[in-house]
Amino acid sequence: MKILVPATSANLGPGFDCLGLSLKLFNETQIQKSGVFSISIGGEGSDNIFLKKNNIFVNIFYEIYEKLSGKKDNFRFIFQNNIPLSRGLGSSSAVIVGAIASAYYMSGFKVEKERILDEALIYENHPDNIAPATLGGFVCSLVEKNKVYSIKKEIDKDLAAVVVIPNLAMSTEQSRQALAKNLSFNDAVFNLSHASFLTACFLEKKYEFLKFASQDKLHEINRMKNLPELFEVQKFALENKALMSTLSGSGSSFFSLAFKDDALALAKKMQTKFKDFCVQYLEFDDNGFEIC
């Protein structure tokens, strides 16, 4: 079997831990039953010995496979990782969702996306990345009694993303330590109103309002201080026809959205201006993970 799991960008400014969308940048994993266990890694993490000795995908896969099938089989895993690690593009969510879905498939169980999403919550306790990795598109999610409730909206085909990826890795745990311990009443209202309005913009295709709807007072500024160049990235994007420009997840990547022609032009300009960063033009994925 082969499974493709997309990269994701979460929060989208004010939608902390609840909003996210799916990008056409995929981790690809092939799994086959084998006489002996083996693992090979290409792309991101290929030079990391730890990922071969203690691979999270493999650990989750075996945990669920053995629970579902009651068997202890050996498998051959071939990873082609295209999602940058610890850059705020959902690399950990792609691993979690991919491992769970693969285990269900290889156990002979029906792969139901709602079930996969609920199980993924065991390993990642906020749904902003795991939901779009599972469902695709733009997704608004919440958790109630250990169940994920999500509403998905397909993203307009005329839109594309420009993602700026710094060399600095930034784990979610590390990034959360930069957050303020308390939030003022006014700032809480600001984020609630902006997250709600941002969601409505995607649902109703009111993209002209995204620039101010995507503003945040909860997490972005404190996280961006770890890499001050990101303030310049955001300013440059918004001055060059980006409809919105926000920190991607917990960082360090930065996500900008624009109409396709504008996004292509923006990507070229950013490649010239921010030579030390990787800049990628990406279209949006509306399917979530797919098993081939």
From Swiss-Prot:
Subcellular location: Cytoplasm
E.C. numbers: 2.7.1.39
Gene Ontology terms: cellular component: cytoplasm
Keywords of this entry: Amino-acid biosynthesis, ATP-binding, Cytoplasm, Kinase, Nucleotide-binding, Threonine biosynthesis, Transferase
A GO MF label: ATP binding
Residues reported to bind ATP: P84, L85, S86, R87, G88, L89, G90, S91, S92, S93, A94
Enzyme class: transferase
One GO term (biological process): threonine biosynthetic process
PROSITE patterns: GHMP_KINASES_ATP
Catalytic activity: L-homoserine + ATP = O-phospho-L-homoserine + ADP + H(+)
Pathway assigned in UniProt: Amino-acid biosynthesis; L-threonine biosynthesis; L-threonine from L-aspartate: step 4/5
Major location category of this protein: cytoplasm
InterPro entries: GHMP_kinase_C_dom (IPR013750), GHMP_kinase_C_sf (IPR036554), GHMP_kinase_N_dom (IPR006204), GHMP_knse_ATP-bd_CS (IPR006203), Homoserine_kinase (IPR000870), Ribosomal_Su5_D2-typ_SF (IPR020568), Ribsml_uS5_D2-typ_fold_subgr (IPR014721)
Presence of the UniProt keyword Kinase in the record: yes
A Pfam family per the record: GHMP_kinases_C
Domain of life: Bacteria
Family affiliation: Belongs to the GHMP kinase family. Homoserine kinase subfamily.
Function: Catalyzes the ATP-dependent phosphorylation of L-homoserine to L-homoserine phosphate.
Record-linked PANTHER family: HOMOSERINE KINASE, HOMOSERINE/4-DIPHOSPHOCYTIDYL-2-C-METHYL-D-ERYTHRITOL KINASE
Official protein name in the record: Homoserine kinase
Lineage: Bacteria, Pseudomonadati, Campylobacterota, Epsilonproteobacteria, Campylobacterales
